[in-house]
Amino acid sequence: MNTFIKIILTALLVLIASFPYFQNGQAPGGLSELQYMGIIPSIILVVGFFTAIAFYCYTLQKVLQNVKPDNRTRKPKSIWFMYLIPFNFIEDFFIVIDVSNSLKNEMKTNKNLTKFGDFGLTLGIGWSVAQLFSFIPNIAGQISGLIGIILWIIHWVLLHRINKVLQQPTPNK
């Protein structure tokens, strides 16, 4: 059922995101900025972005690997679903929620984690929502994309800090 919902939401997103391209005239889309940069800088930017995503996924995978298996709500390798475009735009929400829930479960036996609040859930949902709004074909989409990248980086840094704490010995109860 969960997969069915994800597929329906992904199809809806693709329909909404492609709508401006079927209108008369050329509507500036989410990637229209790349045409102004030229081919080589655009390729470098895209490769750099996907490389950053790989490091982010690796960080999330390590976080889940450092969570006791009984406390995980997702398998560590499933983090790499972030590369399944366009499915990832919906899956990102589920990944962020599952990582946060796994950390909440882990906190019950690892009191070192109590200082991390919602374990980045708000940041993760924030960057995921901003990522969706970045499909708006105007300045609002561009601003949303920038906000999404900023929230994503802050989320990444937080999870890196959490990962360091997970690698420390657990204090006695």
Give the role of each language-model region:
Residues M1-I39, I44, G48-Y83, F87-L132, ...:
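Membrane-interface extramembranous regions at the lipid-water interface
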Residues L132-I149:
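Extracellular/periplasmic helix-loop-helix junctions in multi-pass membrane proteins
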